[in-house]
């Protein structure tokens, strides 16, 4: 893979070249087990032989339960039935193209240009997938009024119980330490959301302002990795109370005027995910990479085009596809609460405490 050249470009070889480098950041996310492979997605969107499938409704089995009955050699057993719910899952596609001039050269020298291209493309798609996951989470916490009857009530209960708000958004007061994350905030938030299931939480996604606040209190430790050239680099991730922390300045920040005393304050959202919260499965594009030449522009230029398709499921939550214009939802459509609901059987929903997803709202 020596040249950025449409004439000599081999899409299959380049695809193998792209997958040959370890994706350190994605691997760390998978280690947290908050973002996991979902075999149901692969069976539905890859292995079933039906091309063009972009959305599916899958059975979602409830947990067994009921009170144990007395085994005395006399009493008859009355078995319980496990409810079967339905869950909407979906795929999304994204594409982008770059010319050779779009890629920055490694000024330290000694690095093959196409290796640099590969690294930059990997980082680009990591960031875009991260943006999509954040849009999904934003949509989930906007579903309080989705549905009718028991379903609407359950959706509102999820949003309320899984939101730990210490920002005092209606209080006309200057920001105090009590309105910012502290040593006890994380534990309190996950306990409120899931009770004795709180140990399932394994990943925190927060704004750098929140991370800096935690760093100043010596509550987080940053992770590093060694690249292929043996250089130690920042991974842009940390740990907090043994949970992986992903730092992302595209996290929601709302600027709100709380009154004449407090003035404008910034309200930061921090997401917390548990094991299996997001099922994420690359399902492939027909032509994932190709290079085209435009002979008439600026004396001729080559453009590298990259396409991705991923399938997504969210634990205990169904994507409804209520408001989606094309086969692939945009991030704005994923942020629409009307597209999300707790998994249900049409009448009743699963218990929201089984869903390892929560958020903290704070002033820093």
Language-model features: locations:
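Protruding loop/beta-arch "assembly-hinge" segments enriched in small, turn-prone residues
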Residues: 1-22, 271-274, 282-364
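Short, cationic low-complexity segments
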Residues: 83, 225-243, 326-346
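Extended serine/threonine-enriched, polar tracts that run as long, contiguous segments within proteins
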Residues: 205-212, 217-219, 226-311
């Amino acid at each position: 893979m020596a040249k950025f050249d449409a004439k000599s470009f081999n899409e299959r070889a380049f695809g193998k070249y792209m997958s040959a480098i370890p994706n350190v950041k994605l691997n760390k996310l998978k280690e947290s087990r908050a973002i996991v492979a979902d075999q149901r997605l692969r069976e539905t969107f890859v292995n079933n032989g039906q091309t063009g499938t972009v959305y599916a409704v899958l059975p979602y089995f409830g947990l067994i339960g009921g009170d144990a009955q007395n085994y005395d050699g006399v009493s008859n057993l009355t078995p319980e039935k496990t409810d079967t719910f339905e869950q909407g899952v979906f795929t999304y596609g994204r594409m982008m193209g770059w010319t050779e001039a779009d890629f920055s050269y490694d000024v330290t020298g000694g690095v093959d240009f196409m290796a640099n291209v590969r690294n930059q493309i990997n980082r680009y798609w990591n960031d875009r997938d991260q943006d999509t996951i954040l849009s999904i989470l934003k949509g989930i916490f906007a579903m309080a009024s989705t549905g009718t009857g028991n379903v609407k009530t359950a959706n509102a209960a999820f949003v309320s119980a899984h939101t730990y708000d210490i920002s005092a958004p209606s209080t006309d007061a200057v920001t105090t330490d009590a309105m910012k994350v502290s040593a006890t905030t994380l534990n309190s938030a996950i306990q409120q959301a899931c009770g004795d299931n709180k140990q399932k939480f394994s990943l925190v996604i927060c704004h750098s302002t929140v991370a800096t606040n935690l760093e100043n209190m010596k509550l987080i430790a940053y992770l590093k990795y060694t690249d292929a050239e043996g250089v130690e680099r920042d991974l842009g991730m940390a740990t907090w109370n043994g949970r992986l922390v992903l730092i992302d300045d595209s996290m929601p920040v709302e600027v709100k005027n709380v009154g004449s005393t407090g003035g404008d304050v910034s309200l930061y959202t921090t997401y917390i995910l548990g094991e299996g919260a997001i099922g994420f499965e690359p399902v492939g594009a027909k032509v994932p990479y190709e290079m085209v030449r435009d002979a008439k522009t600026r004396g001729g230029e080559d453009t590298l085009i990259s396409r991705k398709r991923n399938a997504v499921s969210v634990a205990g939550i169904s994507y409804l596809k209520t408001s989606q214009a094309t086969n692939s939802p945009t991030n704005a459509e994923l942020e629409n609460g009307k597209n999300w609901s707790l998994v249900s059987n049409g009448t009743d929903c699963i218990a929201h405490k089984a869903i390892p997803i929560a958020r903290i709202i704070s002033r820093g």
